[in-house]
Amino acid sequence: MEKGLALPQDCRDLVHNLKIRGRYVLFLAFVVIVFIFIEKENKIISRVSDKLKQIPQFVADANSTDPALLLSENASLLSLSELDSTFSHLRSRLHNLSLQLGIAPAMEAQGQEAVAEKPSQQAGAGTRRHVLLMATTRTGSSFVGEFFNQQGNIFYLFEPLWHIERTVFFQQGGASAAGSALVYRDVLKQLLLCDLYVLEPFISPPPEDHLTQFLFRRGSSRSLCEDPVCTPFVKKVFEKYHCRNRHCGPLNVTLAAEACRRKDHMALKVVRIRQLEFLQPLAEDPRLDLRVIQLVRDPRAVLASRMVAFAGKYESWKKWLSEGQDQLSENEVQRLRGNCENIRLSAELGLRQPAWLRGRYMLVRYEDVARRPLQKAREMYRSAGIPLTPQVEDWIQKNTQAARDSSDVYSTQKNSSEQFEKWRFSIPFKLAQVVQAVCGPAMHLFGHKLAKDTASLTNRSISLLEERGTFWVT
């Protein structure tokens, strides 16, 4: 029997063509699988997006501890891994795959303009700074934020995360608190990159053609009230958060994003980032040169100020004081403890100087800013790596020596050398005792001394503040 037969030339050509076609079939199958993978991940993103865009009429507590993401009544809570991968890993991979396969990015597909980065934002440029003033409510953050708002080459935004807190349903506690932090972080990253469109799904009512009259505290950002962002005023158009010193038309988000990219630096003031560790991906992002300034204040002063500014949310405290009850609600105590612990743990992390935060973190006490505003402003600018201009120095001189403090609880004009101790005469010692018992570890770290009795609390000659030097700068 013969060992083999020679195939005719036609047969050999047929076999060869089948092999080539087989390779194409495999390649096409691979492409189909990739598209299926993309579609699947898009559904995951859509699922999370749909959950987040539920807009119940709910006013979140601005002072709540560790707000947690709450989905609709019958929806299952997404795991932290789903949230994190959805808002970070999957979106980046989908964007890269889309570019490689020639698919338009989602933003462009929806008719939005892609946000081009300023050349100085590219890795290695080393000149553009992204400053994050991290604080909690009633710590003087609006006042300190003006140090950056008043500098002409800095694009400054005031509390942009307010819209997310008002739009997404939050509750306190639970493992899903980390999920809400991931949402904040994802939005924050896009804002630092001048992608202001990221706010549009959270603004209510929604912007039309990138125009809105409802951006929170627009007037607190000089950059949003300057030309060309300040468009001609439109009569009979109500703008809830209008510019302070001039009439402008509705905010054009596209013009604002372009102005952001033209500025040399970017600064944000936020009171809704609770844990410093969640900012690590931002500090490690090569497109950003993040500088974090954590502002802290005596928790006794913070509580006294909140009871005035947010009176309706502290009725239980007032009732406890007026009725002379022995114990305060455990929920209120735990909320206060949670606030103090978040601040303390974040500061301890910053002061440990992990590699990702080294050279990017500064801890500042409001009391030091109030006593020596110009000196502290210079230190903050030096920490941020930005030269301080005479424009800011002049503003500080004029606005920290006001003849009298404004009656507006949100005013940035203060007789700062006197302001920081006024709380000592407005808070009962009974209330101070509770704060000292609950927030003792944080007070010890920040150098806020305990008051032994009513006399020591109200005696200005007895300092309740330890002197600290460059310990606060890392």
Curated annotation (Swiss-Prot):
**Xref: InterPro entries:** Carbohydrate_sulfotransferase (IPR016469), Gal/GlcNAc/GalNAc_ST (IPR051135), P-loop_NTPase (IPR027417), Sulfotransferase_dom (IPR000863)
Record Pfam families: Sulfotransfer_1
Give yes or no: UniProt keyword Membrane: yes
**Cytoplasmic-side segments:** 1-19
Where found? Answer: Golgi apparatus membrane
| Membrane topology, from the record | Single-pass type II membrane protein
Top enzyme class: transferase
Could you tell me which cysteines form disulfide bridges? none
Tell me the protein's name: Carbohydrate sulfotransferase 3
Q: Which organism is it from?
A: Rattus norvegicus (Rat)
| Gene (name only) | Chst3
